[in-house]
Amino acid sequence: MMSTKGITLFLCLLLLALATSVNGGQGTRRSRMTRALHGGRPSARYDAPYCSEEELQACDCSHNPVRDACLCQYDPAGSPACECFCVEPWRR
């Protein structure tokens, strides 16, 4: 028979698992955490929408057979410029 502490721990873990599985584990908690870590801006993965259309279109990775997907992001160190670089397609 489980103790009260064991049941409470089990329920907490179950709720945590359900909360993270609802949206693939990348919900608002992660984005809020990364915003806090990077001075209020979202992390690199979430920065692409903030880059201008011209910057996104100027990025060309067709010359690279492996890293042929373009990722545009803001530098978390605080640079105001949007930087684009080539990555593996699954990292995009």
From Swiss-Prot:
Residue ranges listed under propeptide: 25-44
Q: Where in the cell is it found?
A: Secreted
The answer to whether keyword Signal applies is: yes
Q: Which UniProt keywords apply?
A: Disulfide bond, Ion channel impairing toxin, Neurotoxin, Secreted, Signal, Toxin
Tell me yes or no: is Cytoplasm among this UniProt entry's keywords. no
Signal sequence extent: 1-24
Describe, from its UniProt entry, the tissues in which this protein is expressed.
Expressed by the venom duct.
PTM annotation, UniProt = Contains 4 disulfide bonds.
Cellular component, GO, one term: extracellular region
Q: Name one GO molecular function term.
A: ion channel regulator activity
What's noted about domains in the record? The cysteine framework is XXII (C-C-C-C-C-C-C-C).
Purpose of the protein: Probable neurotoxin with unknown target. Possibly targets ion channels.
Q: What is this protein called?
A: Conotoxin Cal22f
